[in-house]
């Protein structure tokens, strides 16, 4: 179905708004993907904070003008599916990688993040990025580990001064119960 001018302007405005908020973009070739596969991918995209859209390349190209994804405009050729990560940079990569496992017709073509374009092989790198929660957990572990190690060292020194060997103290109750 052909779009009239006002509908095209709405699509461009919607995509431009999404592109301005997005962390990363993956354009993937989807020709040959079944309706069931596409529906499952769209459902998963909604659940993971990925905006997924099939749109004419000229409209997508106009929508990304003035955003960090403008660098990918020259590679927007052929039937493409656009996946914008709205919450986490790696979400679109994980979505496309997961969907491609069960669909050999789905192939990433362009990966854009931070104003740079990467080859399709970088989808795996993008997909392996930790989620926000995982990154915060890693940061918390890195920040608390020195304090934890210091506390263990102080406790070991105190235990050694109070009664000698900590391992021997732990073995005594086991011997009494036998």
UniProtKB/Swiss-Prot annotation:
GO terms for cellular component: ribonucleoprotein complex; ribosome. Signal peptide: none annotated. One of its GO terms (biological process) is translation. Keywords: Ribonucleoprotein, Ribosomal protein, RNA-binding, rRNA-binding. InterPro entries: Ribosomal_uL10, Ribosomal_uL10-like_sf, Ribosomal_uL10_bac, Ribosomal_uL10_bac_type. Pfam families: Ribosomal_L10 (PF00466). It comes from the Bacteria. One of its GO terms (molecular function) is large ribosomal subunit rRNA binding. The keyword Metal-binding does not apply. Disulfide bonds: none annotated. Part of the ribosomal stalk of the 50S ribosomal subunit. The N-terminus interacts with L11 and the large rRNA to form the base of the stalk. The C-terminus forms an elongated spine to which L12 dimers bind in a sequential fashion forming a multimeric L10(L12)X complex. Forms part of the ribosomal stalk, playing a central role in the interaction of the ribosome with GTP-bound translation factors. Belongs to the universal ribosomal protein uL10 family. NCBIfam families: PRK00099.1-1. This is Large ribosomal subunit protein uL10. It comes from Stenotrophomonas maltophilia (strain R551-3). The lineage of its organism: Bacteria, Pseudomonadati, Pseudomonadota, Gammaproteobacteria, Lysobacterales. The gene is rplJ.
């Amino acid at each position: 179905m052909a779009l009239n001018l006002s509908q095209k302007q709405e699509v461009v405005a919607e995509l431009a708004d999404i592109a301005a908020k997005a962390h990363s973009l993956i354009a993937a070739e989807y020709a040959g993907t079944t309706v069931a596969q596409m529906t499952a991918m769209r459902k998963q995209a909604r659940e993971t904070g990925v905006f997924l859209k099939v749109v004419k390349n000229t409209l997508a190209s106009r929508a990304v003008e003035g955003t960090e994804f403008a660098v990918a405009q020259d590679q927007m050729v052929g039937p493409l599916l656009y996946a914008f990560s709205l919450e986490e940079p790696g979400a679109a990569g994980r979505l496309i990688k997961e969907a491609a496992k069960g669909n050999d017709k789905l192939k990433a073509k362009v990966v854009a993040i931070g104003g740079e374009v990467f080859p399709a092989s970088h989808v795996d790198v993008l997909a392996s990025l930790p989620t926000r929660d995982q990154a915060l957990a890693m940061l918390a572990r890195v920040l608390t580990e020195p304090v934890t190690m210091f506390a263990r060292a102080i406790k070991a020194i105190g235990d050694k001064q109070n009664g000698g060997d900590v391992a021997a103290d732990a073995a005594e109750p086991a011997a009494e119960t036998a």
